[in-house]
Amino acid sequence: MTTEIALKDQSCETIEKGSKAMIIPRIESYLSQMPGWDVPLDYQTLTKTFSFKNYHQTVAFVNAITWVAHKEDHHPEICFGYNECKVILTTHSIKGISQNDFIMAAKIDALLD
């Protein structure tokens, strides 16, 4: 019997420059399990916009993301305003999406569980 570890329970790994980005069918397979996350047509980033009641909740969420990013050494682009936060994930060393991006997405989603 094979037991698969949930993405949120995995850790990001170092991805060497020159490694290949994740292939589109695999991206789409992961994406189907990640409600609210989106991949633009160029398949280079993974994005999601989160909404909150106020600025305090938004900033608290951003701060929580930065802690996870620090622990995982995988840092998203974060854009936020009064009650909204957009998270953009990509693996810079390969100029595309890797499993690390989906691990971070799952960990970010888990912050709101």
Swiss-Prot record:
GO molecular function terms noted in the UniProt entry: 4-alpha-hydroxytetrahydrobiopterin dehydratase activity
Domain of life: Bacteria
UniProt keyword Zinc, yes or no: no
EC number: 4.2.1.96
UniProt-listed GO biological process terms: tetrahydrobiopterin biosynthetic process
SUPFAM superfamilies according to UniProt: PCD-like
Positions in coiled-coil regions: none
Keyword line: Lyase
Keyword hit for Mitochondrion: no
Catalytic reactions of this protein: (4aS,6R)-4a-hydroxy-L-erythro-5,6,7,8-tetrahydrobiopterin = (6R)-L-erythro-6,7-dihydrobiopterin + H2O
Entries under HAMAP family matching the protein: Pterin_4_alpha
Sequence similarity: Belongs to the pterin-4-alpha-carbinolamine dehydratase family.
Name by which UniProt lists this protein: Putative pterin-4-alpha-carbinolamine dehydratase
Source organism per UniProt: Hydrogenovibrio crunogenus (strain DSM 25203 / XCL-2)
